[in-house]
Amino acid sequence: MIQKALGKIFGTKNDRIVKAYAKRVAKINALEPTYEKLSDDELKDKFSKLKEQVLAQKLTLDDALYDVFAIVREASKRVLKMRHFDVQLIGGMVLHDGNIAEMKTGEGKTLVATLPVVLNAMNKKGVHVVTVNDYLAKRDAADMGVLYNFLGFSVGVILGGNYDDKARKEAYNCDITYGTNNEFGFDYLRDNMKFRKEDKVQRGHNFVIVDEVDSILIDEARTPLIISGPTNRTLDGYIKANEVAKQMKCGEPADPLDKNSKATGDFTLDEKNRAVMITEAGISKAEKLFGVDNLYSLDNAVLSHYLDQALKANYLFEKDVHYVVKDGQVVIVDEFTGRLSEGRRFSEGLHQALEAKEGVKIQEESQTLADITFQNYFRLYDKLSGMTGTAQTEATEFSQIYKLEVISIPTNLPVKRIDQNDLIYKTEKEKFDAVIAQIKYLHAKGQPVLVGTASIEKSEKLHELLTKEKINHSVLNAKNHEKEAQIIANAGDKGAVTIATNMAGRGVDIKINDEVRALGGLYILGTERHESRRIDNQLRGRSGRQGDPGESRFYLSLEDNLLRIFGSDKIKHIMERLGLKEGESIESRLVTKAVENAQKKVESLHFESRKYILEYDDVANEQRKVIYRYRNELLEADFDLHDKIISNREDYIANVLDRLEIFDGDSKENFDIQKITSIIKSETTEILDENKLSKAEDYKELKEEIIKELRDFYEEKMAPVDNEQRKSIEKMLYLQIVDRDWREHLYQMDILKTGIGLRGYNHRDPLTEYKKESYNLFVELVMRLKSDSIRTLHSIRFKTQEEIEAERRAIAELQAKLQEEEQKKLKMSGADKGGEDLEETKNVPYRAPKKIGRNEPCPCGSGKKYKDCHGKSGPKKGLFANND
């Protein structure tokens, strides 16, 4: 209350910031007459000279801002036929300063971005513009590219599905690159899995503008980007667990206020946290159905995990709400956009459980090869900024997580949209009856209406009801998204009725004509409050763009998920006291406030969830930075790895002696020479001279002798190749080892994270425990990298030239022999057909020779089994092969 009163007297912090920017706008406006007089060539020449000064570091970007913004505005007038408004100049400065510009729908965010994009592209380090989908990336790159090209900048676009490294590298090497958050993030992960530096596509992380920043940095922040590979684990457990889950009954949780109260049924649901709790009765039932004595023994730990996921799949996740079945696959529906998330899968076996539930092919479980959260990816940039129509409700999170300030930019024209109070009904049926009646009324008078739904299921239900009423309408959901932009663009036509899930069509303006303005503009009808106030505000923001009239209202029921799960009993009591009859609703600011409080509860839960994920990922992120830095040093190194190999060899030998409890200061009586040589032989294939080792008098002499012998073995091994080849081999092996050991480390970290929450029951902070144990795992990883590099380098064997030539001859003979046999078969086949021209056999396609079994005799005539002869060397490629 006090803050509000002070705000009215002195203005809010946001007001003061905007006023400060407005003073700078006056300086830009003062330059407009000067640049208006210049010809196109003179304008380009002026800009080129500014760019040269920036590159020569004679001028900072901040110093150049006034002239650059004035030039961009003038260039835009000439090539785009659009002039930046003063408020758009303010938005551009907010973005350049690395903050979030909150601008209402229709205020021209795409045009605003051109100002800081051009300014920050002048230093030739690259600017990335992130959009929510490929359509917007392609559209904005094409539309704004005309302006950028006029000023001498190149523009690239990164699209999903096109993974040609050369094309992507060219796009990243452009001055300005457009793409989606997923594509930028995955390219970063893929770059850190490349084996040649020239194959990397990204060139750094300088400046990024994130369009619809709330959607990307808030809504999608709970879902990390993961590159994974198959694990070859059995999938039968998911099918069995699904059968068991279907036989279990959901009950009610115990009353926390009654000590004697017990949970009923086989399991209970916590819908707020999407969790399942199995009761004692449920455990007994599951053990009987699985045929095991103890569901939670170590031997059955996997079974209990399968059952937990099967229960979630069957009782918490709904088809056409959380996912759809498309072309025999379970595809996730993005809960914030209503779009299908093709290629994305639920983790921890939940996706496999859903596949078992729906009876489609169960895909293999995957193992993480590389991962990163959006929070940590976007924090890689030297400067991060964003723009959206709705960010103030999440200002605290933007500040705490990303160090970004949200600044609301005034609209160019006053907002005329009327936002009505919510109408609340007892049941969903009554609500939908009222919704249909309102749509019929609006449709009859020709006022366009955009109907927002929270799920595909609800949008299809509305579709059926409107079809019965013979009202022409369009439906836009994840099942029907091909014409998304067109459907949304036409939603402002007279008499149009459009049903859309959540914020489908974001980034596409709904324009109306004068006739529709006279009818009251676009009517927004929400059929359910979303868990986030932001999503509701986005829906409302589709109407009333650029000073147009409009109206919005939400229709709710006590059976809606938000009110049922999170709503207080206050709303229910009010409705009961009023004694409402069927079909009657309540409209009250008090009730609307109660609904907003329910939304705040959910937002708080989600914020804590994202914060929790980030706190844990921050631990992994520090380790990721170290490994990726080390890997990049290897990848980009033109130097010899000789010194690193020497150092790693010393550490490896120290580790071997440590494992045998041989320490510095020990006498030679404590040296078990046979064990030392046995371990080193098993790990490196090298056979040490026991006599020489026996002569060592102390730890230092023993260690030096082992180092000398291994070094000599290695030098002898590398003798057949020249220095450049050796460097290339060593680099490749080191990179492979880093990737393999990092992959295993991520798996260990996943296991640690899965069970760490249980530490809380022992009054220990899970996060502290996770930090401590993950550090220990990382120390082990570093040691393993050193040891594995030495083991692998010493295990390689180069083929001699004689061996290579012998193999080539044997393979050539084998192929000739097989082809001769094949020709005989073909001729016999022609003769059997009774006088057919045998010359025709020349045109018969070549057939691959029969595959030789690994245990069959090798066709080369050596007398060995195929696997021990040419079957051993055949599949191996390159200069060397591992001695397995």
Swiss-Prot record:
Q: Which co-factors does it depend on? A: Zn(2+)
Sum up the protein's function in the record's words: Part of the Sec protein translocase complex. Interacts with the SecYEG preprotein conducting channel. Has a central role in coupling the hydrolysis of ATP to the transfer of proteins into and across the cell membrane, serving as an ATP-driven molecular motor driving the stepwise translocation of polypeptide chains across the membrane.
Provide the assembly information.
Answer: Monomer and homodimer. Part of the essential Sec protein translocation apparatus which comprises SecA, SecYEG and auxiliary proteins SecDF-YajC and YidC.
Task: Report how it sits in the membrane.
Answer: Peripheral membrane protein
**UniProt entry tagged with the keyword Lipoprotein:** no
What does the entry list as the binding residues for ATP?
Q88, G106, E107, G108, K109, T110, D509
Q: Among the entry's GO cellular component annotations, what is one?
A: plasma membrane
Q: What is its main location?
A: membrane
Q: Identify the coding gene.
A: secA
The name this protein carries in UniProt is: Protein translocase subunit SecA
Annotated Pfam families? P-loop_SecA (PF21090), SEC-C (PF02810), SecA_DEAD (PF07517), SecA_PP_bind (PF01043), SecA_SW (PF07516)
- Does the entry feature the keyword ATP-binding, yes or no? yes
Region annotation (Disordered) maps to: 822-884
Q: Where in the cell is it found?
A: Cell inner membrane; Cytoplasm
Return the Basic and acidic residues bias intervals: 833-842
According to the record, cofactor stoichiometry and binding are noted as:
May bind 1 zinc ion per subunit.
- Write down the NCBIfam families for this protein, in alphabetical order: PRK09200.1, PRK12904.1, secA
Q: What is its EC number?
A: 7.4.2.8
Which HAMAP family does the UniProt record give? SecA (MF_01382)
